[in-house]
């Protein structure tokens, strides 16, 4: 029987309402099941932490509440590992403790025991946790990440495997020192104009210049007013911070890739130019590339067979380009260390006086005598024992942060207890390890004398490890120490430095730098605001 038209509209309306209700009910069921599953999963993860050494733990929210409470008292951009170390101090946590930050991260085990750190890195040779350095892509090409994923890469690599030694770097010291004349002139100009400058930026340019000299054997003009190198470098690295935010990365990535390609093109062109200029094919200005070219011309790299006597193979050129990008970016992490060294020396004038006395006795008391000494006897840097100790103490107090490793095995033993660490992130916490009072008495004090030969209390084995050890160690540590020594030697003879933060600037804990607290607002850990400073010429 046909439905009268007068009843058609109400029936249609009723049918639509029933359809919507049914669809809504159908959607509620999987959503409810998903919520139940998530709650069960979170509860299961949280229960795994029940009997583990850890800070106060919320039954459902894990360690998010305790970290957020700590963060509320700190500057928003403070370096995250410092927050963890403050929690460790507050609750007097042992050298092995666990953090529950699921679902953002897998369970994390923090380690600040030197023996256990040695076992994980040097005995078990645990690899770095996946994705740690990939955040620097595209500034560093993916080719480099594939290279360092090979456990034996340092042996076959066409640069690192050839001449990456302290003895080779010392030969480059005279040219490195000469390249810093422009920096000294700039500091002199800022002193005349009473201008405040960013120490971290100056240190970055200085290390970029010295690393370029070591790699290419040529001056990069990093202190020129419109330097191609510093412009390309900053354009390729500045987006790193914004790209750490997964919501911003898609918007940043296209322009970042474009700037990275420009940076790589500048490096590639310089590599080719260096090869073309290497006229005698073996000898000449000491550099990492010159040593590599000498082996390449003898067909000494099976992974990169020579195409012809006068040309670079495409694969070899790309390997040298990606290596150059990685070395230049990695080396500039030392800019934060040298910046903190200037800050600490300003805060400890007696140590600064001792340091200048050492510089004068070993190399001379003015710029010209120092440059002449380094030209004739670059190994004099090895006689700067207190300078070396100052840098080691600075690295102890302000390391680059924890090293994240893959689980070397399913379990870990410590002090008679066995821990299940399957699917854990293993974090060797330098910030905690370097400030243990049983390893470094009065650990928050700046005391470089503890690192001098014959110190009353020797440093325990494997307790000082800012460059790490085993797989993933910093291959450039010898070069970094040489560069920082050269910079201290040339600047402290002529200039005094003092921090110039605004009164309203954010301030972190004094033990972590105060106004110059460490932030995560750079390629690596960086002093807040880049450490603004004023420079004054020393009274003779």
UniProtKB/Swiss-Prot annotation:
Q: Which keywords does the record carry?
A: Glycoprotein, Heme, Iron, Membrane, Metal-binding, Monooxygenase, Oxidoreductase, Transmembrane, Transmembrane helix
Q: Which GO terms describe its biological process?
A: mycotoxin biosynthetic process
Q: How does it sit in the membrane?
A: Multi-pass membrane protein
For binding heme, which residues are annotated in this chain's numbering?
474
Glycoprotein listed as a keyword: yes
Record-listed E.C. numbers: 1.-.-.-
Glyco sites are at 17
A GO CC term assigned to this protein in UniProt: membrane
Cofactor(s) needed by this chain: heme
Gene3D superfamilies for the chain:
Cytochrome P450
Tell me where the transmembrane regions lie.
Answer: 20-40, 325-345
Top-level taxonomic group: Eukaryota
Q: Name one GO molecular function term.
A: iron ion binding
What is the role of this chain?
Cytochrome P450 monooxygenase; part of the gene cluster that mediates the biosynthesis of the indole diterpenes penitrems. The geranylgeranyl diphosphate (GGPP) synthase ptmG catalyzes the first step in penitrem biosynthesis via conversion of farnesyl pyrophosphate and isopentyl pyrophosphate into geranylgeranyl pyrophosphate (GGPP). Condensation of indole-3-glycerol phosphate with GGPP by the prenyl transferase ptmC then forms 3-geranylgeranylindole (3-GGI).
The text of the family note is: Belongs to the cytochrome P450 family.
Kindly provide the name given to this protein in its UniProt entry: Cytochrome P450 monooxygenase ptmG
UniProt organism field = Penicillium ochrochloron
């Amino acid at each position: 029987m046909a439905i009268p038209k007068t009843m058609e509209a109400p029936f249609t309306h009723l049918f639509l309402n029933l359809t919507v209700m049914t669809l809504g009910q159908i959607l509620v069921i999987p959503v409810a099941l998903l919520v139940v599953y998530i709650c069960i999963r979170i509860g299961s993860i949280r229960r795994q932490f029940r009997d583990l050494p850890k800070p106060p733990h919320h039954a459902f929210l894990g360690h998010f509440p305790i970290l957020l409470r700590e963060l509320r008292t700190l500057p928003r951009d403070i370096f995250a590992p410092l927050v963890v170390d403050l929690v460790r101090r507050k609750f007097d946590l042992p050298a092995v403790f666990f953090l529950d930050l699921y679902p953002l991260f897998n369970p994390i085990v923090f380690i600040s025991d030197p023996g256990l750190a040695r076992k994980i890195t040097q005995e078990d040779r645990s690899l770095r946790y996946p994705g740690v350095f990939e955040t620097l892509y595209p500034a560093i090409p993916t080719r480099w990440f594939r290279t360092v994923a090979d456990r034996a890469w340092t042996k076959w690599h066409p640069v690192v495997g050839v001449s990456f030694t302290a003895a080779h770097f010392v030969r480059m010291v005279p040219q490195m020192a000469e390249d810093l004349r422009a920096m000294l002139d700039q500091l002199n100009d800022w002193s005349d104009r009473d201008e405040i400058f960013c120490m971290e930026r100056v240190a970055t340019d200085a290390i970029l210049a010295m690393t370029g000299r070591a790699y290419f054997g040529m001056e990069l003009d990093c202190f020129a007013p419109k330097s191609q190198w510093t412009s390309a470098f900053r354009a390729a690295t500045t987006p790193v911070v914004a790209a750490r935010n997964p919501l911003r990365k898609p918007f940043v990535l296209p322009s970042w890739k474009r700037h990275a390609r420009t940076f790589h093109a500048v490096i590639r062109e310089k590599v080719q130019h260096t090869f073309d200029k290497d006229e005698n094919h073996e000898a000449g200005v000491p550099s990492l590339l010159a040593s590599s070219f000498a082996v390449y011309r003898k067909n000494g790299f099976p992974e990169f067979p020579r195409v012809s006597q006068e040309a670079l193979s495409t694969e070899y050129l790309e390997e040298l380009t990606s290596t150059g990008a990685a070395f230049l970016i990695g080396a500039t992490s030392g800019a934060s260390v040298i910046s903190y060294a200037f800050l600490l020396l300003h805060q400890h004038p007696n140590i600064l006086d001792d340091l200048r006395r050492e510089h004068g006795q070993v190399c001379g008391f003015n710029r010209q005598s120092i440059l002449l000494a380094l030209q004739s006897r670059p190994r004099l840097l090895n006689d700067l024992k207190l300078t070396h100790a100052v840098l080691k103490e600075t690295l102890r107090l302000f390391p680059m942060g924890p090293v994240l490793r893959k689980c070397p095995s399913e379990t870990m033993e410590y002090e008679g207890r066995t821990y299940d660490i399957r699917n854990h992130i293993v974090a060797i916490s330098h910030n905690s390890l370097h400030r243990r009072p049983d390893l470094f008495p009065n650990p928050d004090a700046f005391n470089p004398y503890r690192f001098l030969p014959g110190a009353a209390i020797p440093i325990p084995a494997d307790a000082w490890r800012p460059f790490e050890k085993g797989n993933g160690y910093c291959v450039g540590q010898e070069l970094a120490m040489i560069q920082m020594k050269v910079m201290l030697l040339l600047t402290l003879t002529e200039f005094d430095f003092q921090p110039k933060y605004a009164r309203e600037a954010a301030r972190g804990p004094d033990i972590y730098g105060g106004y110059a607290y460490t932030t995560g607002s750079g390629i690596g850990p960086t002093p807040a605001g880049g450490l603004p400073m004023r420079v004054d010429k020393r009274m003779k």
